[in-house]
Regions:
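Divalent metal-binding acidic/histidine catalytic loops
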Residues: 1-147
Length: 147
């Protein structure tokens, strides 16, 4: 019977030329993420590796590139709303998602009717002791954005 250990990530650092290329492509993806909520979280995770990009980050960046090639026609359509719309907010968190620092990731979206007004995915500033605490911080962030 085989071992159920998680596969090791390739922690080999990229050469200086490859690291410069990685940073340039990740920066372009970060610019693109402002209009594409479907890639925002992935780009945020890729930008964590900007200081010392590794082969694992390079493979993740290539995977994002393949996703963008396959979904290049993804657009956000805004339709005329004939009725009054209410503003709603949704939030979620990933408790202790950062394996290095143990910090959680918060994400959320603010909508008015069917239109996106704002969306985000950010690492929380503090280490939380439970998933409920991480959710509460995400809820407070969403409430602040609504106001």
């Amino acid at each position: 019977m085989g071992s159920l250990r998680p596969a090791r990530m390739n922690e080999e650092e990229l050469s200086p030329d490859e690291a410069t290329r990685y940073r340039g492509i990740a920066a372009r993806a970060n610019y693109l993420a402002a209009d594409r909520p479907d890639i925002m979280h992935a780009v945020k995770e890729l930008c964590r590796g900007m200081a010392k990009p590794t082969r694992a980050y390079w493979h993740k960046l290539k995977r994002l590139g393949r996703y963008l090639v396959d979904n290049h026609r993804t657009v956000t359509r805004y339709y005329w709303q004939r009725h009054e719309s209410e503003v709603t907010g949704y939030s979620d968190s990933d408790w202790a998602g950062c394996r290095v620092a143990g910090k959680s990731t918060s994400g959320g979206v603010i909508r008015m009717g069917s239109h996106f007004l704002n969306f985000w995915s950010r690492t929380q500033n503090h280490v939380t002791l439970s998933s409920a605490e991480a959710e509460l911080i995400a809820l407070v962030k969403c409430s602040a954005e609504l106001l």
